[in-house]
Amino acid sequence: MSEKLYQIISKVFNVDDSKINDETSPENLEEWDSFNFYVLLDEIENEFNMKFDLNETLEIKKIGDFKKIFQKHRINE
């Protein structure tokens, strides 16, 4: 799951995946802006065949938060 997630993030933010970890956030990744965040949400929803609800999107402050949401949705890929 992490590898696939990191590949999507790398593609959306146009950064090397070596710059991405669970602590990656808008504070330490310049490319993470509001537009790219919504592109990222869409890409993840399509790749993992899921939908984020509004509260989930508001909870996401760093990459590790996606994994918590995946657990809630029982996504283990």
Language-model segment annotations:
Residues 1-41, 46-77:
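Phosphopantetheine-dependent thiolation modules in NRPS/PKS and related acyl-activating systems
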